[in-house]
Amino acid sequence: MSYKNTNNSHLILFKLLLLLILYSADLTASSSCRSECGGCKCGGIAIPYPFGIGKGCYLEKSYEIECLNTSGKLVPFLSVISKEVVSIHLPGRQSFGSVRVRSPITSAGCSSDGKDSAPVMNLTDSPFFVSDINNLVGVGCSSKVSLEHIKQNMVGCELNCSTTNASDSNSIPFFDKTGCSFSYTFAQVCTGNKPEDMGCDGRGCCQASLPREPQQVIGIRIESNDGKSTTSGDCRVAFLTDEFFSLSKLTKPEQLHAKRYATLSLGWIMQTRNTSFVNSLACKIRKDTDTAYSNDQSIKCICDYTMSIISDIRYANCECNLGYKGNPYDSDGCRDIDECKENPKYCKETDTCVNFEGGYRCVGDKTKAIMIGAGTGFGVLVLVGGVWWLRKFLVKRRMAKRKKKFFKRNGGLLLQQELNTRQGVVEKARIFTSKELEKATENFSENRVLGHGGQGTVYKGMLVDGRTVAVKKSKVIDEDKLQEFINEVVILSQINHRHVVKLLGCCLETEVPILVYEFIINGNLFKHIHEEEADDYTMIWGMRLRIAVDIAGALSYLHSAASSPIYHRDIKSTNILLDEKYRAKVADFGTSRSVTIDQTHWTTVISGTVGYVDPEYYRSSQYTEKSDVYSFGVILAELITGDKPVIMVQNTQEIIALAEHFRVAMKERRLSDIMDARIRDDSKPEQVMAVANLAMKCLSSRGRNRPNMREVFTELERICTSPEDSQVQNRIDEEEEEDGVEEEEEVVTIVHRGDSWSIGVTAPASSIVASPPSSDVEPLNPLLTW
């Protein structure tokens, strides 16, 4: 009885000891993996972290590797997809990681039982995807193989064993999403290659590239050339693989079917919902560094955060910094590289290689290098300082010469002479520096352009004292045009009238002369009357009439009240500016002329704008004060009709001057037909008729029949108060019209020549002295000088 109990006790003890040994072996193997968590191996295949064998050795369930004993051999399996693992590679800086697995082969007509295999790879809800490094390979005859369940495109190739012509067999048809085929021809990139070393060309073997987009669900379909699925006939196989198949490696489909598997490369990303894991690695986020790698050698690894290409989950892509190697996903996985041991030739033979964390340095005799560096640095410093001082001196000297040259070329000496002759009459204007105006206009930016005039471009500027100004930068002019520029400065210096744009100063030290005017905020009259997009209903009749009075007052002052009568010579709606209260100001005196009291006309080259030029001035070559009156009459016609100075008659499609069209309509008593519709309802008919009659007098073909600007101004003021008392009668001098028919036809003809002219004919002007109304004129005190 005791002997039997003793035997039983020994048996139980032996079993317990055996179980303890087996458990210890398993625990040792498991703890060995867990101690490194990423340094495990299974069947000779390295399993780097975040993959791992056993609980605690992998990051998440998706990265779990099962090490199974298959036919007496340890084989790693990726448990989330139940696929045998061939190798695992960590992602680099510009690529994803890869896991090579054994994937089942799709077959048709190969099984003795008549059953075909068509497995579908489903990687949904995992960090894995089929990468474009793989190819679709088909082996067999008279079939088409294609991919199923993929996004965007349909990919496939055709098998044909009956083709004997080599030129026909080099083309592999691919299929797009519409079912149409296009050919892709393999090029022999290596000279001397044997034909059997080239890729599958469709004769018993074909292959096609996968789309670049990652795929998580993918299948393979085999069908006959007529497009029907088949389960009979010769054996045909198709599979995805990252291996290169050539004619020399071609295997019969039956042998491939017997293998059952092909090697497939799966891409993977470091997908984790727990960002604290990446934080625990103490890696630097790449966006915080200026370069691909960090210059801080104490940083062992660098990570990128981005959105997953296969899901809406953020993933991390990490790598060891320069000077380190290892697994960045393992805690303290990046270890220093000892460059001095790996390659002692990093340093010269005379130097000593010293390794440190993240790098190395070469230590040698520094005395000679320091002396050479100090001497070179001092010499370079002296040389650079000398060159800088010399350059500064030369630039300053050259700028002084340029300013002096520009001042002389831009008429500075001539302007000084003109202003000196008017000493005591003209107050000095401010002389602006080029730097001031460049700062005010942001270096004459295109965004500051207000408009382009006949003599230059106008910019909006802001002075340092906060004043907004208009800066007129003249065009490049020759010496013959300098008189016009100087003329404008001298004339505007004499003018002190609230309806004339005020000149604030000028700059002559630039390549082209620059004038600075007061800024008029609401642009020109032409824009408000004629531009279609303006749709400006502020231009009611009362405002138009007031603008006409303002212009007439300014011209009356220029003709009568200035120290010397001034003829503008370019009166037009684009030269009439409107301030914030829509009060008119006359601008652009580039072609103006000042005449002495005893002169009756001014002889000059004809200039002006088509539609505004006095026909008598054109015929007689004499510019008088009545020529400005004629141009003002055209503006009155614009205010009444809303038409441009040159119009196209709708009935005849004939291009004529507005002045002629207006006179004909008035003669035929059709004022209501040509009146601007925007003022028809709010205007007083008797006022419009009175202004129209006045415009007719101003547009008379003979200058002697026109009123002077003093009379025009007085009449317009009377019309504003009591239009029924207007002294201008609605009558047309028939004799005058008959005498001027030929002349007016000539005027109409020249309209077709363009918007402006300069014709080589001499012409003069007359001068009338009269007292301007006190309401519009400030004392004529000297304003500007040089």
Curated annotation (Swiss-Prot):
Please list every transmembrane segment annotated in the UniProt record, as residue ranges. Answer: 370-390
Q: Which residues lie on this side of the membrane: Cytoplasmic?
A: 391-786
Catalytic activity of the protein:
L-seryl-[protein] + ATP = O-phospho-L-seryl-[protein] + ADP + H(+); L-threonyl-[protein] + ATP = O-phospho-L-threonyl-[protein] + ADP + H(+)
What kind of membrane protein is this, topologically? Single-pass type I membrane protein
- Listed binding positions for ATP are 450-458, 472
Concerning PROSITE patterns, the annotation shows: EGF_CA, PROTEIN_KINASE_DOM, PROTEIN_KINASE_ST
Signal peptide segment = 1-30
Outline the segment boundaries, as ranges, of region: Disordered.
766-786
Annotated Pfam families? EGF_CA, Pkinase, WAK
Residues recorded with modification Phosphothreonine = 433, 604, 609
Sequence ranges of Low complexity compositional bias: 766-775
Q: CDD domains recorded for this chain?
A: EGF_CA (cd00054)
Q: Where is the active site?
A: 570
Instruction: Give every Protein kinase domain span.
Output: 444-719
Q: What's the protein here called?
A: Wall-associated receptor kinase-like 17
What's the source species' lineage? Eukaryota, Viridiplantae, Streptophyta, Embryophyta, Tracheophyta
Which gene name belongs to this protein?
Answer: WAKL17
